[in-house]
Amino acid sequence: MAPAEKAFVLRKKMDTAIEDRPGQTLTDDHQVKVAIKATGICGSDVHYWKEGGIGDFILKKPMILGHESAGVVVEVGKGVSSLKPGDPVAVEPGCVCRLCDYCRSGRYNLCPHMEFAATPPYDGTLRTYYITTEDFCTKLPKQISVEEGALFEPMSVAVHAMTRGNLKCGSRVLVMGCGTVGLLMMAVAKAYGAIDIVAVDASPSRVEFAQKYVGAKPFTPIAAKENESLPDYAQRYKQAIIEKYGEFDFAVDATGVGICIHTAVLALKRGGTFVQAGNGKPVIDFPINHIINYEINVLGSFRYAHGCYKQSLFLVSNGLVDVKPLITHRFAFKDALKAYETVASGEEGVLKVIIGGPDA
């Protein structure tokens, strides 16, 4: 019998505990067991903790949190050929069927049978060991730490958004939101040849970080007038941006906030591309006539698909994107709740918070 493990468990809304969980054993020849050494905290993790659910995904029983993880392989199935015990890996936190049309076309993020870590009812990665399949692990070279490997998950979100929008070299790019994902979108856009990147966020420290991190040009959101309609506000907001920086070829929203989305669409050139990557309200006002008349390409971007982790590995290992500056806080596993409280505080200067493994 496998030894017991430690796990950071969400028992119910705002109720967490470090628990002993039964040890796990491999059940398939192509599985690997990974000792988790570093886990980043995502906004969705905090939302589950604070609200007990996201949309249709409602916590109905205790769930292990975490999905941005990396660690070291400790055991492999007899069918595993590309990994061995001792290999450091970034863990892709979804399990798919591999049989549906979406999986077979490489768009496995759309698999209707997806089992995604720390999405009810499936347990996450904040535990001693996580069992997954060989092909959902990305081996890390010596120059990349497991902390950097943990950031491959949000970076793959950024890679997928740029890929969905078919970002062209020489594009002028507008990014709404300077959280970790928004900053990584800027970094990936720069690596892909964007010539101008404008960063928009209400947080002065985050906009300043974007300037230093990728050379982004800053823009601070303008305030709405009293009783001003959202379309009128968006028109003023857009005008303020383009008077300073001109129109854009490509815009991406990482906030999910209605005014940011509306404004970003309006700030595009005719024939421009808008990618929505941030979750928000289920229904918002959208400038549909503008989209039609300007032939704006509007795309949704959900998580990541085939090749995104490998592309993240390429960008980081070749020095095209540096994820290390994004890590602002580190906590031991025993202090996982403090880590969540730090992210939830919304304090200036907090970007990516990393929790070490139980035996790190």
Curated annotation (Swiss-Prot):
Reported function: Polyol dehydrogenase that catalyzes the reversible NAD(+)-dependent oxidation of various sugar alcohols. Is active with D-sorbitol (D-glucitol) as substrate, leading to the C2-oxidized product D-fructose. Suppresses growth arrest induced by a p53 tumor mutant in fission yeast.
Pfam families attached to this UniProt entry: ADH_N, ADH_zinc_N
Record GO biological process: sorbitol catabolic process
Similarity section: Belongs to the zinc-containing alcohol dehydrogenase family.
Catalyzed reaction equations: keto-D-fructose + NADH + H(+) = D-sorbitol + NAD(+)
Gene3D superfamilies per record: Medium-chain alcohol dehydrogenases, catalytic domain (3.90.180.10), NAD(P)-binding Rossmann-like Domain (3.40.50.720)
Organism: Schizosaccharomyces pombe (strain 972 / ATCC 24843) (Fission yeast)
Protein name: Sorbitol dehydrogenase
Gene name tied to this protein: tms1
Names of the cofactor(s): Zn(2+)
The UniProt record lists the keyword Phosphoprotein: no
Free-text remark on how the cofactor is bound: Binds 1 zinc ion per subunit.
Residues that coordinate or bind NAD(+): D201, R206, A277, G278, N279, S301, F302, R303
Cellular component aspect of the GO annotation: cytosol
Residues that bind substrate: Y48, E153, R303, Y304
GO molecular function, one term: D-xylulose reductase activity
